[in-house]
């Protein structure tokens, strides 16, 4: 194993693994170490199982366009949302059985709302269930089988479904209850149709299967007033050069799998930084010139290009 690259879906219905909300050293609150240990064990077993199951594969790639209506809302100006869902279907070269489907799209998994107290991956769960097992009834399709993996794309700025109603595949509108299921299944239908079209036309077969990657550890400076929170023990550990040149450690990965390019981003990346349209409007979170140009996807060279948010962090 040369590189393990991972990312959080950023679901709002799970224990805090970053310590942004749960770690308050000043009042004696720290991580849920039992949950952290459980998560670490599951990561290790997932990696070892994947390595033990390595097999030659063929790959079909596609990209679904995600409509704004019934899918996305941007809660801060400028109104720019992620409308690209890059997809890859990896199949066993000998048996033609699905090994895994890979998808990435930018949306906060928070459809259950702030009062939901159970652990869930939100709409991601319903997306993965549909991709693996299919759907019955209206807009039905046979699932791909194998494993479905979903990575959160650019969600900063902020991509949410809380401000909209979502109509499910049966025509029923959901304002709260059922919204996450509707969104996950609607998204899976788009993914299925995009991959099916590429398979029928035989245009999505990935000829080049080589793998390459680059990984870089960086230290990001922390300014005031966040330094005050550090001094008071209100922020999780993992900080360097205290107290005057406070920095936080993180990592960025660039990965190529054949004609698929992936970059990871720590934290939440604004869609306009990835796809274009960057501005610096009044009331912006950070007052600065819009210097993030050209957008990152224009710099990437894959036939499909993915940006995994909360990558190598959270």
Give residue spans per PLM region:
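Non-catalytic substrate/cofactor recognition surfaces at enzyme active-site rims
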Residues: 1-314
């Amino acid at each position: 194993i040369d590189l393990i690259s991972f990312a959080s879906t950023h679901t709002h219905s799970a224990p805090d693994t970053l310590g942004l909300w749960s770690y308050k050293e000043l009042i004696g609150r720290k991580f849920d170490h039992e949950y952290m240990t459980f998560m670490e064990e599951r990561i290790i077993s997932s990696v070892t199982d994947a390595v033990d199951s390595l097999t030659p594969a063929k790959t079909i790639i596609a990209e679904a366009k995600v409509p704004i209506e019934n899918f996305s809302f941007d809660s801060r100006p400028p109104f720019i949302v992620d409308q690209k869902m890059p997809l890859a279907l990896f199949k066993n070269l000998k048996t033609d059985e699905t090994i895994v489907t890979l998808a990435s799209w930018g949306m906060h998994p928070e459809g259950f709302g702030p009062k939901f107290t159970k652990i869930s991956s939100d709409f991601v769960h319903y997306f993965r269930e549909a991709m693996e097992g299919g759907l019955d009834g209206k807009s039905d399709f046979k699932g791909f089988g194998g494993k479905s993996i979903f990575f959160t794309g650019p969600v900063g700025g902020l991509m949410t479904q809380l401000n909209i109603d979502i109509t499910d595949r049966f025509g029923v509108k959901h304002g709260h209850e059922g919204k996450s299921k509707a969104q996950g299944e609607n998204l899976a239908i788009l993914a299925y149709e995009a991959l099916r079209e590429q398979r029928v036309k035989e245009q999505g077969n990935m000829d080049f299967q080589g793998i390459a990657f680059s990984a870089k550890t960086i230290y990001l400076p922390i300014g005031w007033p966040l330094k005050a929170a550090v001094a008071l023990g209100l922020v999780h550990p993992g900080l360097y050069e205290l107290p005057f040149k406070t920095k936080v450690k993180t990592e960025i990965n660039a990965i190529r799998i054949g004609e698929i390019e992936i970059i990871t981003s720590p934290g939440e990346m604004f869609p306009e930084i990835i796809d274009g349209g960057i501005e610096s409007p009044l009331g912006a979170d950070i007052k600065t010139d819009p210097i993030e140009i050209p957008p990152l996807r224009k710099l990437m060279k894959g036939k499909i290009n993915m940006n995994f948010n909360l990558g190598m962090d959270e």
